[in-house]
Amino acid sequence: EGGYRFLGLVNSDDPEGAVWTGSNETGFSIMNTASYNLKDDDIKEMDQEGNLMRKALRVCKTVQDFEHFLDTLPRPMRVEANFGVIDAYGGAAYYETNNERYYKKDANDPNLAPEGYLIYTNFSFEGRTDEGKGYVRYENTKKIFKEMRDGGFTPQRIFQQASRSFYNSLLDIDLMDKEQSPNNRTGWFVEQDFIPRLESTASIVIQGVRSGMNPELTTMWTALGYPPTSVAIPLWVKMGKEQSALVTYDASYKTALLDWYSVQLQKNVYSIHRGNGQKYLHWQLLWNCLLYTSPSPRD
């Protein structure tokens, strides 16, 4: 495509189109969460986030490059999102972005990020108050990351304790807790405001490098499909097209093998299709799956 080589998460039916998370050969990495409270105009043609990220991966090396990239894009940008970026020089920031402007949130600012990290779901802090989505999931993640902090943040712990978490902060329940487990009753539970949801299609942890390290060591840990029924595969840009066959497009399945198998297991978990059945998950089956996809689920 020209520019930097990159590795990205794409839709199975559009591999040359939008990129939803990715890293390039310089260690620059990007992701986004959709925002639902930042748009302040009536422009109809939107949803260019994935195309924006694909372009950024080709031309950006640093967080500052991304900022310049946003500055020079034609308006309207046709996005409403929180873009998260890191680089190989210690840069880390979110950019709350709408059609005309962006608001930078620097993860290295101790006043803004005293714990050294920022958490986003589907609203922007600069957006309209109490609009947007994901407020309960935001509180879930805050608690999970606070508890995780003392033991250190590793890809394995983030996948296990966040991506596969069934904690709900508003209800103060954790389905992984033996005493609160739905297995004590029918084995079924209503899915509402957990981090993994029916519509979840992947979970990715990008393990960056410290300043001075080889940016080729930047690792894109990738779990395709429904995160609780998937496994994480490490990927590197330098491998080019020689990535694991589990995560690359398979014409026989019209998706990646890992995604296909994960979704088959997910279908068993969300097996009720009449009425409001898709709001219910079969925890007993999911628990059995977690025993195999997770190193140490709680009893």
Question: Where are the regions a protein language model picked out?
Answer:
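A contiguous strand-loop segment
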Residues: 1-50, 63, 67-92, 98-132, ...
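Short, flexible beta-strand-to-coil junctions
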Residues: 11-14, 35, 86-89, 164, ...
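Alpha/propeptide regions of enzymes that mature by internal proteolysis
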Residues: 32, 46-74, 138-176
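A short, charged
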Residues: 62-64, 68-69, 124-153, 157, ...
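Long, His/Glu/Asp-enriched segments that create or flank divalent metal/ion-associated functional microenvironments
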Residues: 111-153, 201-205, 214-236
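Alpha/beta-hydrolase fold catalytic core
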Residues: 177-189, 193, 198
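Substrate-recognition/cap regions that form aromatic- and gly/pro-loop-enriched pockets
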Residues: 192-291
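Conserved small/polar residues in nucleotide/adenosyl-binding loops
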Residues: 292-299
